[in-house]
Amino acid sequence: MRPDQPLEHVALLANGLRFHAVAAGPADGPLVLLLHGFPELGRSWRHQLPALAAAGYRAVAPDLRGYGETGLTGPYDVATLTDDVAGLVRALGRERATLVGHDWGGAVAWAVAARRPELVERLVAVNCPPATALFEAMRRSRSQLRKSWYILFFQLPWLPERRMAADGAAVVARALVGGSYRRGVWPQDELDAYRAAFARPGRAKAAIGWYRAAFRQALRPRRRGRARRVSAPTLILWGARDRFLDRALVEPSVLRRALAEGNVPKVVFVEDAGHFLQNEAPERVNDELVRWLGRA
C-alpha cells in the first residue's frame, strides 16, 4: 500500500458521539488506534496507516472530539476524552488496542494507559510527555513557558478561535509548516484540507476548547492519593528539533514518575526532525513502530 492510496472512511458511535475515522488493514488484525494532535486530523497518520496495514495490523485514525468530521459536542476534559477512546475500542469490536498518540493525542493516550490500563496493549507517544509533565514544566521552566505561550493565549475568550478561523484558517497551515523542522513535508493539498477543516463553524473553538479544559484542570488543587502509573510497554518517539516541547520533558526522572516500577520505556530521538515527527520522518517512524510492535 502507498500513502497516496485511498483509505477506508468509517463512522463509529462512541461515548454518545459520532466519530469519523480513516482506517486500513485486515479487519481481524491487531488493533492500533492512532490519535492525532493539534492542529491536526486523523489524516495526519496518512503515512503510518498503510505501513501498519502492510504489517498485518488493523490501523484506525479517528478525527477526535470536535475535529474534522467528528461531532462537535463537548466537554473536552480528559475524563471525556478517555471515555471516547474506550468507546472507540468497543465500537471496533475489541477489548484492547495499542495506542499511538501525537501531541494532544499522546496526552490522551497517556491518560487512557494510566486510567484504563485494561484497554491498552501497548503505548506509543510521539512528541508528547506524560500527562501532567507539561504543566509542571511550565511552572518551573522559563524555556518551556516561553514555548507554551500559545496555551496561555488560548485562555482568552473568543479571540483565539476568531484568529484561528480567519482567512480560511490560514494560521493552521502556517503552524504546520512553521512547526516542522524539515521543509517540504506538507503538500499543498494537505494544507488546503486542514484549512478547510478548521475554517468550518465551531471547529477552531472546539480544538482550542481542549486547551481551556486542560488549563482549568491544571489549576485545580490535586487530590491526595497515589498517582496512577502506566504499566503498558511504552515507546516514545521524539523529534528533537521540537519548537514547542523541550526534550527534558522525557528525561528519565520525568518518565519514572509516570511509569510503573519495572516499566522501562524505549525512547528514540530523531535529531533532524521537529514536532510533527510522523509527517517529517515517516519512514523512520514507520520502521520504529513496526519493529517495536513486532516484538510483542
Model region roles, listed by residue range:
Residues 41-42, 107, 273-274:
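A short, glycine- and basic residue-enriched loop/turn
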Residues 1-8, 17-19, 60, 67-100, ...:
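Flexible "cap/lid" subdomain of the alpha/beta-hydrolase fold that forms the substrate-access gate
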Residues 23-69:
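Conserved HGGG/HGGXW glycine-rich cap/lid loop of the alpha/beta-hydrolase fold
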Residues 43-46, 205, 287:
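Alpha-helical elements of the RecA-like P-loop NTPase motor core of helicases
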Residues 35, 270-273:
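Short hydrophobic "strand-cap" motifs at the C-terminus of beta-strands
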Residues 273-282, 286:
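Catalytic histidine-centered segment of alpha/beta-hydrolase-like enzymes
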